[in-house]
């Protein structure tokens, strides 16, 4: 039965690890953009992993395009999050300071809060400078471009894209993954489908095990039961096996930290 219905069987973690030296890792744009959400020490580890597996990494052209379009969007969003956190923390401090002379608040607790405030203010300031530096100088963007040079897949022609979008209308109407969860989007409605078609084309041309690394856990990528992600959407695997005849375990970005 397994041979006839491979789409319903999941690859174990041990089997996945055994394939690391012979597979191709295909990165989604969201994973690349997560680099701009990480602390600097984590970014260095991420770059080390990418450099180690550089020859095995590919990025769909459409995913790379979306990555570039959204770098500044992500950085500005992170800066706004810091500002909002600062405001919330300052409001808390102001409320506490108005009551710190009450007898039930010990001097020790008050001193600890002062130390905490100083450290958090320092963290906010350092992270703000770090993100602003990325926004202006683009250091991580340049480093990633260097690491992934030659790793981006070939783009579809405008004619091919029109055909994919035409297929997308039918697929989305029938909830055929991936991408139908984005059917209501005004922009990049067929982005997931275009990425998927790039992956299928690459898999058909290359005799490699494919590991697609993404943090997209919508139901048009991931099978869910009782609120838990239990594996890849079987329809995706069925389509992949039909085109390729090989396993493609789709994992979120935690697969990177398991390398």
Predicted regions and their residues:
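Active-site-proximal, substrate-binding regions of enzyme catalytic domains
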Residues: 2-210, 217-259
